[in-house]
Amino acid sequence: MEGQTARRVITEAKFLDDCLTERDSYYLSKLDELYSSAMSSFAQFEDQQNGARSARAEENIIATYDSIGNLMQEICKELPALKVYSFETQRENHAEVSRVVSKLRNIHTGYSEFIYYTQRAFEMLFRLAYGGSHEEHKTYLITKTPVAFPVQNYAVHKIANVDYKIENTVMCVMLRGALLPSMIVSKEIEEYSSHGYVTPFALFKIKRDDLRDERDMQYVFDLDKSYFSARELDGKDLVFADPMNATGGSLVTIVRYLQDLGVKPKSISCFHMISALKGAIRVVRSLENCTVYTLWMDPVLNARAYIMPGLGDAGDRVNGVDVEDYPRNIIQLLADYGSNISGLYRSQLRKIEETVLGSR
């Protein structure tokens, strides 16, 4: 780690960049050039008063994005630990993921709709990681239905048995934006498990210093406001579900700290709706036996370390905006999700409450 002060662990951007190879840096530079070309056309595209100018800009944007997509596909072939949904699935699935990500990005997508598409996104990511193949052993679901005449009816459904993949998992939550996505993935694990396995939760309070730029960014891990047991993480399959992976700094900071405590994860899986390529590469270069699953890969970061084109602040869009001097704690966040979400994720809420209350 870079440093530890007053129950805080701090990692600096340079620590993360040291893991990048020359080839990584070349690819990232090439993508910066391509995206700069696209940005040069954005203002012209906005100028709807000049139809011909706007049409030419649209053509350039589409052509540039095609080039960006082709280059990122080439990069991901060289890094098998990066799993991008549209690169890993059949072509008939690509329209669905494009529409889901487009709705998440859209500035006009309101809170309820954003939550709906967030749930869809992480369900898709779960299937990408754990959905099972035709070769895997099958198990049967025998379900009692509401039809009771002339006798009580039951339905039988055959599914892949993925218990061995999911029943050693612990959800690792980077507060606060990752709370709901982690509950969604935990719920999927419970539903796919033939034993109704409910994941334990480890809760980590970490933030980056937004007064800094991307090149000198610091990631501050607050141990006093985190809830976890290192002993209960050792030998486990650690799962991180966070809406966005911009720089990878928060995730690497947490895992490196756990490793310093002697934790040896069996595996690490990271689920994201959108990742920046730089952040995704940093994660898989820095951490052994780690796989990044992302619904969409974006090409670049801006100087403030935000993903471009991105979708804004995912934490604010999922949880609402906190008052700066009075940020909500985890219990307040859970309460603000309301009865519909609380009812759906009842088992997950119980585990989270046990983690928070049992750590003090």
UniProtKB/Swiss-Prot annotation:
Cofactor(s) needed, names only, are: Mg(2+)
What GO terms in the biological process aspect are recorded for it? Answer: UMP salvage
**Does this entry carry the keyword Amino-acid biosynthesis?**
no
Binding-site residues, uracil: 307, 312-314
Annotated GO molecular function terms are:
GTP binding; uracil phosphoribosyltransferase activity
Q: Where are the transmembrane segments?
A: none
Q: In which pathway does it act?
A: Pyrimidine metabolism; UMP biosynthesis via salvage pathway; UMP from uracil: step 1/1
Entry EC number(s): 2.4.2.9
Q: What does this protein do?
A: Catalyzes the conversion of uracil and 5-phospho-alpha-D-ribose 1-diphosphate (PRPP) to UMP and diphosphate.
The name on file for this protein is Putative uracil phosphoribosyltransferase
Q: What is the lineage of its organism?
A: Bacteria, Pseudomonadati, Spirochaetota, Spirochaetia, Spirochaetales
Gene symbol of the encoding locus: upp
